[in-house]
């Protein structure tokens, strides 16, 4: 989906630094990664968790496994 090609937008609220962990799909990496969101605005390449991001953007048969492997690699 086109939304998965958008770069993550931190969605700043005033001068407050972004501090809410969300997930975005990275076309370059081919999987989802975390980023900090400020709580206002942003774009639609934002997901509550890695699994929902992978399901939406890749339709991978085992999105939880991919997310688990990605988190363990960090």
Identify the meaning behind each predicted range.
Residues 1-74:
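Cysteine-rich, disulfide-bonded extracellular modules and peptides in secreted proteins
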